[in-house]
């Protein structure tokens, strides 16, 4: 009877043994991290709609490594490094997630869908009522972006790479994805993965930052409203969204697809198109977010993430979000003194996304 090569029969185990201890340890770590993300998502500590598919994708991609026909290690999910058109078209007929990745993720379409959905949830009336407070606190919440840029450059990253990783400080996953695609495409996979991993963990960690930097007496402030807020009707909000979209696209054309998507969502919300609103705010937003989490998990292949620059990206991403959190809280303190005590500093942290 011919001897059976169990390394070939069970290639996930065989490639784990043959890939070397460092790569094997990285795969095991990512598999365990995937289980942790699923658990934290199930418990509601992290966002389940992103973290559960992301965790499962991390497990599958690092367990499902096999030997490809050319003798190299690979998988049947997707290959984000393909650039040759013929090779890409061939792979799209084999790797089941390659069409989704190529046609929605790598061109930023999925980020635009998410922004469109967010727009349907956005009430621009608050920005119209309190423009100074909104913009000031949002600016404070970008402290991590401003400070991380020169730090990253000093650590040896190029200006484009530094700007891409600094965008993590804005706590806006789709914007990080879009920016890294435009400025540092060779690093957009690790930067985007780092961004979403940290964003998920940050939402669990920011409450502790609040407790550390804001005393309980200030956290418990109940703000008094001296006069009733002005209510703006739908036509004013729609006109405001259209004008703001035009201004931002004019000033920053490189990000115009995201601005357009966001304000299109606002327009759908304010124009009373109920069926379109239900679709964009429901299936489109949640479906895109779910697929985004799944693709991010599948991109967490140990072979892809073992880049010498990854350690720098991990440190800089964490630093950017930490500094942005501190900046938001400092902005809250400044508003507390401007309002003579009638302002809860915790609000400063909540405006980091704006």
How does the language model describe each region?
Residues 1-78, 92:
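N-terminal alpha-helical transmembrane segments of multi-pass membrane transport
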Residues 21-30, 99-114, 162-167, 254-262, ...:
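Structural signature of hydrophobic alpha-helical transmembrane segments
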Residues 24, 124-149, 303-329:
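Entry/N-cap segments of selected transmembrane alpha helices
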Residues 127-143, 147, 159-205:
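Membrane-core helix-loop-helix motifs of multi-pass transport proteins
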Residues 150-159, 191-223, 330-340:
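Juxtamembrane and boundary regions of transmembrane helices in multi-pass small-molecule transporters
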Residues 196-273:
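Membrane-embedded hairpin module used as a gating/binding unit in multi-pass transport
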Residues 244-332:
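Transmembrane helical segments that form the transport core of multi-pass membrane transport proteins
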Residues 352-354:
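Conserved small/polar residues in nucleotide/adenosyl-binding loops
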